[in-house]
């Protein structure tokens, strides 16, 4: 592995499980929770990308809300205002994956900065990591809102390079989203793809430098594991 001077994480789906919202979805719409969550996430991503391409950028929370409205319309589900608010707020409480805290603790011993680069708004990022109890691990929380364009735009990835003041080739970008890993590799980051579900990597002209099945493998990959492990 080349020299690493900083590690930058995606948030949604990498550190925290977006489909933890399925439980609350199922409370409001019995037996439809997983279906809603899967469709909601896909449409959320599509809207964030399409808005960027159209030059009509909206914040990730707005794209999330718009996506939920679409899903309920498509599934012929009546979405009350209080339900919409509750479900969108649940995106601020998505749960960290089980290995996240221990992995971050080990990585912190490596004495390189850890950062998050997300399409989420600054408020959303702060809320998610705060509610998950992992905010203290990160020196920078970076939102694509700052450039009004979503990942995988190079302009979004450039934010991390500028904020950490580290040349892109010496930053490791970690994401479970193959489209994100492709975009980051195209930008010039070293990339680690977290393939928890044994998915097939996207055919977008780029390949990750490393593939792991969970973040618990990352400390050993970087040789930053704490002495007591």
UniProtKB/Swiss-Prot annotation:
Family matches, as Gene3D superfamilies: HAD superfamily/HAD-like, Putative phosphatase, domain 2
Binding site for an (S)-2-haloacid: 11-12, 41, 118-119
Keyword entries, A-Z: Hydrolase
Coiled coil: none
GO molecular function: (S)-2-haloacid dehalogenase activity
Key word Transmembrane helix present: no
Active site as annotated: 10
Region (Important for catalytic activity): 175-180
Applied biotechnology: (S)-2-haloacid dehalogenases may be used for the biodegradation of halogenated substances and their derivatives which are widely used as pesticides, herbicides and other industrial products.
Catalytic activity: an (S)-2-haloacid + H2O = a (2R)-2-hydroxycarboxylate + a halide anion + H(+); (S)-2-chloropropanoate + H2O = (R)-lactate + chloride + H(+)
Hydrolase found in the keyword field: yes
CDD domains: HAD_L2-DEX
Annotated positions for site Important for catalytic activity: 14, 151, 157
Enzyme Commission code(s) on record: 3.8.1.2
Signal peptide positions (record): none
Domain of life: Bacteria
Major enzyme class: hydrolase
NCBIfam families to which the protein is assigned, alphabetical: HAD-SF-IA-v1, HAD-SF-IA-v2, HAD_type_II
Membership in a protein family: Belongs to the HAD-like hydrolase superfamily. S-2-haloalkanoic acid dehalogenase family.
Function of the molecule: Catalyzes the hydrolytic dehalogenation of small (S)-2-haloalkanoic acids to yield the corresponding (R)-2-hydroxyalkanoic acids. Active with 2-halogenated carboxylic acids and converts only the S-isomer (or L-isomer) of 2-chloropropionic acid with inversion of configuration to produce R-lactate (or D-isomer).
Protein's name according to its UniProt entry: (S)-2-haloacid dehalogenase 2
Classification of source organism: Bacteria, Pseudomonadati, Pseudomonadota
């Amino acid at each position: 592995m080349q020299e690493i001077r900083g590690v930058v994480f995606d948030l949604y789906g990498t550190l925290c499980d977006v489909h933890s919202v399925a439980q609350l979805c199922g409370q409001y719409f019995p037996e439809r929770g997983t279906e809603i969550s899967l469709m909601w996430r896909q449409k959320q991503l599509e809207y964030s990308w399409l808005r960027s391409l159209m030059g009509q950028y909206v914040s990730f929370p707005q794209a999330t809300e718009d996506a939920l409205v679409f899903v309920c319309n498509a599934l012929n589900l009546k979405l009350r205002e209080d339900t919409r608010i509750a479900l969108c707020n649940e995106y601020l409480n998505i749960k960290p994956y089980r290995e996240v805290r221990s992995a971050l603790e080990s990585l912190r011993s490596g004495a390189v900065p850890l950062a998050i680069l997300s399409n989420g708004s600054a408020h959303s990022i702060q809320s998610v990591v705060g509610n998950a109890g992992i905010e203290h691990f990160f020196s920078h929380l970076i939102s694509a809102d700052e450039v009004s364009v979503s990942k995988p735009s190079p302009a979004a990835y450039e934010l991390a390079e500028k904020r950490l003041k580290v040349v892109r080739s010496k930053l490791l970008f970690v994401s479970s989203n193959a489209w994100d890993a492709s975009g980051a590799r195209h930008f010039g980051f070293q990339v680690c793809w977290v393939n928890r579900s044994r998915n097939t990597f996207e055919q977008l002209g780029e390949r990750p430098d490393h593939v792991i099945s969970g973040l618990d493998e990352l400390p050993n990959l970087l040789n930053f594991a704490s002495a007591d492990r």
